[in-house]
Amino acid sequence: MNPSQHAEQFQSQLANYVPQFTPEFWPVWLIIAGVLLVGMWLVLGLHALLRARGVKKSATDHGEKIYLYSKAVRLWHWSNALLFVLLLASGLINHFAMVGATAVKSLVAVHEVCGFLLLACWLGFVLINAVGDNGHHYRIRRQGWLERAAKQTRFYLFGIMQGEEHPFPATTQSKFNPLQQVAYVGVMYGLLPLLLLTGLLCLYPQAVGDVFPGVRYWLLQTHFALAFISLFFIFGHLYLCTTGRTPHETFKSMVDGYHRH
């Protein structure tokens, strides 16, 4: 049996391992996660409103540009983003039983292909960081980290409303602030590998099902929970990208590779 058949078989037997989430059935943990996600949107919306009413920064182009994002990094970034969207969409649609059996088969195939492509992207990311100059941005300097993180937190909560300058501007030595660095390291070297691993085990259930018969339930629950956690990161990441001198400035840097001060 090929991997696609394994995936389709596993998906068709999903209800045997974990109930599909329908409007009539939402487990308590999913309700809590949903409330937290909505709460996050409200907090980000309030923060955006306070920023808009605060001191305005000049949007004038100061001509200070630093080339921080190579073509390889930008290609990886946009490929990663597209695959994440496709995987989340196909996975959530299946879990919430939004379509019929015929569409499920197509969504499983999309999910499988995108999963392998995401694995390739992640391996490329690890390779770029291992042999290129991008890796040092992910090495956390532990000495004084708490003080730096506190300073960055204060900026996000108060300083940004007052038009203060960023305490840790992006440079060729460090393109991430302390909070960004920890978040990106956690996602790229923790959350994403776990998502890929649980996804592969879901694709090849016979690898664990015969040895640990009850593990399939927890495998699916874990994979779905990790995917839901990634939603928090994605929304937070997108919002923070709007906190530059202009709302579109950071997005532009991922197009041409230049960070603007």
From Swiss-Prot:
| A Gene Ontology cellular-component term | plasma membrane
Q: Which SUPFAM superfamilies match?
A: Transmembrane di-heme cytochromes
Q: Does the keyword Transmembrane apply?
A: yes
- Similarity comment: Belongs to the PhsC family.
Organism (species):
Escherichia coli (strain K12)
Which residue spans traverse the membrane? 25-45, 81-101, 108-128, 182-202, 224-244
Q: Which UniProt keywords apply?
A: Cell inner membrane, Cell membrane, Iron, Membrane, Metal-binding, Transmembrane, Transmembrane helix
Induction (UniProt): Up-regulated by the oxygen-responsive transcription factor FNR under anaerobic conditions. Repressed in the presence of nitrate or nitrite via the two-component systems NarXL and NarPQ, respectively.
Any Gene Ontology biological process? respiratory electron transport chain
Q: Tell me the residue numbers annotated for binding a menaquinone.
A: 237
Where does the UniProt annotation locate this protein? Cell inner membrane
Q: Which residues bind heme b 2?
A: 111, 223
Where heme b 1 binds, per the record, is at: 77, 237
Membrane disposition: Multi-pass membrane protein
The protein here is known as Putative cytochrome YdhU
